[in-house]
């Protein structure tokens, strides 16, 4: 551990990459754990694709309301706050995460790149009008009639190119 700490302190540019372990420590389910992962209990093709959004709308909405409520019920843990302190004292320069819970930003980090998007914002799939996450819990229909969805990458969608450019 001491060797790692020395490397961290001596490095010129440190980027932290986080994934599901950070979210599970906050109490959120991961996707692929054999006994408790989301995809053990739910079929991703029925719930986490653009096709599901358009052809299985009610189940799509209920699934993402369930996930959003889980995020609201949880929150950043000590590890998130430690990374915030490291950013403040310039031990790390940024965080790249696969997580969509937004906990790094809630903990105070400012230089966060969310590869798969975030539950912190939602938008209409048809007209792209932005919505607050709390609005989605009560109403998933946009003023244009389209379906409101989380600002996350669904199965079959590409990762946003600007995320890679910024991350580099």
Q: Model regions: which residues?
A:
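Conserved catalytic core of sirtuin-type NAD+-dependent deacylases
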Residues: 1-168
């Amino acid at each position: 551990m001491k060797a790692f700490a020395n490397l961290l302190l001596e490095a010129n540019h440190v980027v932290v990459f986080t994934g599901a372990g950070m979210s599970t420590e906050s109490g959120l389910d991961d996707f692929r754990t054999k006994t408790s992962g989301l995809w053990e209990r739910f079929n991703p093709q029925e719930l986490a694709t653009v096709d599901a959004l358009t052809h299985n709308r009610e189940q799509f909405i209920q699934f993402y309301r369930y996930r959003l409520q889980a995020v609201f019920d949880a929150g950043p843990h000590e590890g998130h706050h430690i990374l915030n302190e490291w950013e403040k004292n310039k031990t790390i320069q940024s965080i790249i995460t696969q997580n969509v819970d937004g906990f790094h930003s809630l903990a105070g980090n400012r230089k966060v790149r969310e590869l798969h998007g975030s539950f912190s914002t939602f938008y209409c799939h048809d007209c792209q009008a932005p919505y607050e996450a709390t609005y989605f819990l009560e109403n998933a229909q946009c003023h244009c009639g389209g379906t409101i969805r989380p600002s996350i990458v669904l199965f079959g969608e590409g990762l946003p190119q600007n995320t890679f450019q910024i991350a580099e």
